[in-house]
């Protein structure tokens, strides 16, 4: 999902209700490599002959940088800017296959605010709101000079509101977090309105080693909760193990007022991972996600797997 925020979710996808201390900040880098299922040229052409404009890539890459700042103890604001690459894009239209090459560029900026409703240790609850801003290019062209469809561009051209909620609690030595984010797509480039998006699930984590003085576990969400947020007391290096179970849904897109019936889909993912937290506040996390179940409509390929890597630093 596009937007990223900061909080200690225990994993790389699920948000937590935690916020940064007032006046504290963090910066991070996140890399996501998604491998789709591979469909042959013949399969794409056959779908196109049925009126389905199907496409495939070799892989999709999202490399993003982000930062967060604690406005107050309850309110944290974060931004994330991605670089997007779609490798070896192939698309079929009216029975003809086109090799559109590699598509890459700066994507759309996401801005999120997280407001924590609860205080102190134990369970927590936070509300999340934000906006995806159309900073990405929408004018990439094929080798023949034809402008690519909006869904293949690095950017969308649309201003998309985002809203969500995050909750968390401790269960003995384990941390449990749950979150959901919804993104409303508005009209973007080339009279295209991409499908709305929903992402939500749960994360279970366990810390090995200790980090004294951190009254909350970290910061970060899509950059991963790879950074501890509090520097009041000395801390020691530690490891976290985590497992995330989450779902993703994408609605059908609309072009020039016409709904693309074969677009969109939904999937359920399982993503185990680990994170190393250094004594100096630098953290590195990685996870490998595999789809347990998916129903992707024919214009898009199924998912094979997703690898995520994140690095972050609190200050």
Spans of model-derived segments:
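Residues that define the transmembrane beta-barrel architecture of outer-membrane proteins
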Residues: 57-63, 103-109, 123, 144, ...
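Repeated loop/turn-to-beta-strand initiation elements of outer-membrane beta-barrel proteins
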Residues: 25, 75-79, 111, 120-124, ...
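Extracellular loop and loop/strand-boundary signature of outer-membrane beta-barrel proteins
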Residues: 14, 49-53, 94-101, 148-153, ...
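Surface-exposed strand-loop-strand hairpins of Gram-negative outer-membrane beta-barrel proteins
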Residues: 2-5, 32-62, 92, 151, ...
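Transmembrane beta-strands of outer-membrane beta-barrel pores
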Residues: 31-37, 81-87, 117, 131-137, ...
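Long, hydrophobic/aromatic-enriched structural stretches that serve as scaffold segments
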Residues: 52-112, 116
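Residues on the lipid-exposed face of transmembrane beta-strands in outer-membrane beta-barrel proteins
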Residues: 16, 27-31, 65-69, 79, ...
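Outer membrane beta-barrel transmembrane domains
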Residues: 40-49, 192-315
């Amino acid at each position: 999902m596009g937007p990223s925020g900061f909080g200690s979710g225990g994993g790389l996808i699920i948000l937590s209700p935690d916020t940064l201390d007032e006046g504290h900040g963090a910066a991070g880098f996140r890399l996501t490599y998604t491998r789709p299922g591979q469909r042959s040229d013949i399969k794409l052409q056959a779908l196109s002959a049925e009126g389905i404009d199907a496409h495939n890539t070799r892989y999709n890459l999202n490399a993003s940088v982000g930062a967060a700042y604690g406005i107050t103890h309850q309110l944290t604001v974060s931004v994330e800017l991605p670089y997007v690459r779609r490798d070896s894009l192939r698309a079929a239209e009216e029975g003809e296959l086109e090799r559109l090459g590699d598509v890459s560029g700066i994507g759309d900026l996401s801005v999120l605010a997280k407001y924590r409703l609860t205080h102190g240790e134990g369970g927590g609850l936070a509300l999340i709101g934000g906006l995806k801003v159309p900073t990405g290019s929408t004018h990439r062209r094929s080798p023949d000079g034809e402008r690519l469809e909006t869904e293949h561009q690095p950017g969308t051209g649309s201003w998309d509101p985002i809203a969500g909620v995050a909750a968390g609690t401790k269960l003995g030595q384990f941390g449990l977090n749950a979150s959901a984010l919804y993104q409303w797509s508005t009209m973007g480039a080339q009279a295209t309105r991409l499908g709305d998006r929903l992402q939500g699930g749960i994360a279970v984590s366990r810390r090995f080693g200790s980090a004294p003085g951190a009254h909350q576990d970290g910061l970060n969400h899509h950059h991963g909760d790879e950074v501890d947020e509090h520097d009041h007391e000395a801390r020691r290096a530690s490891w976290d193990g985590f497992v995330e179970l989450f779902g993703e849904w994408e609605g059908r897109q609309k072009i020039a007022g016409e709904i693309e019936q074969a677009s969109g889909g939904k999937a359920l993912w399982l993503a185990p991972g680990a994170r190393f937290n250094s004594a100096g506040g630098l953290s590195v996390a990685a996870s490998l996600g595999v789809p347990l179940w998916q129903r992707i409509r024919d214009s898009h390929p199924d998912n094979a797997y997703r690898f995520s890597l994140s690095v972050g630093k609190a200050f």
